[in-house]
């Protein structure tokens, strides 16, 4: 029998010190990594529940184990909420990650050697959309599309490439593209060449759920996503699709790619989908857009170049070359002041992916804390102060003090 009095701090103090240190870091630092966010206490409560004890291979009503009547209810609730949230015909909430959700789609409609079009990783795409370092780039013939001289997607060029290479699958979505995608145009291109159309909306899912960014579900054959990032749920993945793909996708997830689903994580996904359907979530996402736009414009006013000229989403890239800095260096200097960003390649970057010429900045986490335009502008000015004086210890110390003043005013988790 387990004693509930024996909590983690008692059972494993060595681990607990790291958990507490990370909690303090999240409390005190300004988080600007676009793929990170804070989950609600309800999401964490679901993920830390006794549902973690239950094995449930299969799907609701079709399990390989007994005792699944209650976890069936959990998973069906998550499926129903997800379908309603995005207007989908079919949904699968079992993928453990966005990468596995993408793999499930690939393996349901592609064969090794098939041609796939996805956004160039160096122009803002994602590893799983055909990078040579990823399984997708090793199994399939990848033909990338990218940005034009204005650092916008060139749909005419995309169509020209598609007509030439005749892909089996066209992929939309990105990890570092600030502007809006034209899903309808991409669907039309896919239709012209007889390709399936898949959208990986991982970065934009929360914005889409709130109706402040275009919804790909009516246009795409398949839509995948993570459940964290802007959606503010637990770490995990999901798939939505036309109803005709239900059987092939279900079998592609289980038993082809995964075994038992993580029922405690699926429960947390269900909570996140419920939260995303509330009016306050729409207000949150509207503020995410305002904060990102404010930061981009403020940094531009301080002499920094914003890739694509600005942002229409939660994220944007900053070209550091005018400052004579690399992304790796800027990441480190800002980190000393307790501002967390990530180095990121910019289009046609002369530096390696481990160094880069840019940084990626996102507004989801600071908006969850309650930051509005005034605070977003202050954060951007703090970033610019560091980038203007990266080796000045007095500037770093003064900036860190201002960061702590901000974060103390806006705690992540209140009473």
Curated annotation (Swiss-Prot):
Catalytic activity, EC: 2.1.2.1
UniProt record, GO biological process: glycine biosynthetic process from serine; tetrahydrofolate interconversion
Site (Plays an important role in substrate specificity): 228
Catalytic activity as recorded in UniProt: (6R)-5,10-methylene-5,6,7,8-tetrahydrofolate + glycine + H2O = (6S)-5,6,7,8-tetrahydrofolate + L-serine
Modification sites for N6-(pyridoxal phosphate)lysine: 229
The protein's enzyme class: transferase
Keyword Repressor found: no
Disulfide bonds: none
Residues at which (6S)-5,6,7,8-tetrahydrofolate binds: 121, 125-127, 352-354
GO MF: glycine hydroxymethyltransferase activity; pyridoxal phosphate binding
Pathway the protein takes part in: One-carbon metabolism; tetrahydrofolate interconversion; Amino-acid biosynthesis; glycine biosynthesis; glycine from L-serine: step 1/1
Required co-factors: pyridoxal 5'-phosphate
Compartments, record wording: Cytoplasm
Pfam families hit by this protein: SHMT
UniProt cross-references to Gene3D superfamilies, sorted A to Z: Aspartate Aminotransferase, domain 1, Type I PLP-dependent aspartate aminotransferase-like (Major domain)
A cellular component term, taken from the record's GO annotations: cytosol
Keywords tagged on the record: Amino-acid biosynthesis, Cytoplasm, One-carbon metabolism, Pyridoxal phosphate, Transferase
Matching InterPro entries: PyrdxlP-dep_Trfase, PyrdxlP-dep_Trfase_major, PyrdxlP-dep_Trfase_small, Ser_HO-MeTrfase, Ser_HO-MeTrfase-like, Ser_HO-MeTrfase_PLP_BS, SHMT-like_dom
Function description: Catalyzes the reversible interconversion of serine and glycine with tetrahydrofolate (THF) serving as the one-carbon carrier. This reaction serves as the major source of one-carbon groups required for the biosynthesis of purines, thymidylate, methionine, and other important biomolecules. Also exhibits THF-independent aldolase activity toward beta-hydroxyamino acids, producing glycine and aldehydes, via a retro-aldol mechanism.
Complex and partners: Homodimer.
HAMAP family: SHMT
Protein family according to the UniProt entry: Belongs to the SHMT family.
Protein name as catalogued: Serine hydroxymethyltransferase
């Amino acid at each position: 029998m387990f004693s509930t009095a024996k909590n983690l701090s008692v059972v494993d103090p060595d681990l607990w010190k790291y958990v507490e240190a990370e909690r303090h870091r999240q409390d005190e630092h300004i988080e600007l990594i676009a793929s990170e966010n804070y989950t609600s206490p309800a999401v964490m409560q679901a993920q830390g529940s006794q549902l973690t004890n239950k094995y449930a291979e299969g799907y609701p009503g079709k399990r390989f184990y007994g005792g699944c009547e209650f976890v069936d209810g959990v998973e069906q609730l998550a499926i129903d909420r997800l379908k309603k949230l995005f207007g989908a015909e079919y949904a699968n909430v079992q993928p453990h990650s966005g990468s596995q959700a993408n793999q499930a789609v690939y393996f349901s409609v592609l064969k090794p050697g098939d041609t796939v079009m996805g956004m160039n990783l160096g122009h803002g795409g994602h590893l799983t959309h055909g990078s040579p370092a990823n399984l997708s780039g090793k199994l399939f013939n990848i033909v990338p599309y990218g940005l034009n001289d204005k650092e916008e997607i060139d749909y005419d060029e995309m169509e020209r490439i598609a007509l030439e290479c005749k892909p089996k699958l066209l992929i939309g979505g990105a990890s570092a593209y600030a502007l809006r995608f034209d899903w309808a145009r991409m669907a039309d291109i896919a239709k012209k060449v007889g390709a399936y159309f898949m959208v990986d909306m991982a970065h934009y899912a929360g914005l889409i759920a709130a109706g402040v960014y275009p919804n790909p579900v009516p246009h795409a054959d398949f839509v995948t996503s993570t459940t964290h990032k802007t959606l503010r749920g637990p770490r995990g993945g999901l798939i939505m699709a036309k109803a005709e793909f239900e059987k092939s996708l279900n079998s592609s997830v289980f038993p082809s790619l995964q075994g038992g689903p993580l029922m405690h994580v699926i429960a947390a996904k269900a909570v996140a989908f419920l939260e995303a359907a509330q009016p306050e979530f729409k207000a949150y996402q509207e503020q995410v857009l305002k904060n990102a736009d404010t930061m981009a414009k403020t940094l531009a006013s301080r002499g920094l170049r914003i890739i694509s000229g600005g942002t229409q989403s939660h994220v944007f890239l900053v070209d550091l070359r005018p400052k004579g800095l690399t992304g790796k260096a800027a990441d480190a200097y800002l980190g000393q002041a307790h501002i967390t960003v990530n180095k990121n390649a910019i289009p046609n970057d002369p530096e390696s992916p481990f160094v880069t010429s840019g940084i990626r900045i996102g507004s989801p986490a600071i908006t969850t804390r309650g930051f509005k335009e005034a605070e977003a502008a202050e954060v951007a000015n703090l970033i610019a102060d560091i980038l203007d004086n990266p080796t000045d210890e007095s500037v770093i110390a003064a900036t860190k003090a201002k960061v702590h003043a901000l974060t103390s005013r806006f705690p992540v988790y209140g009473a």
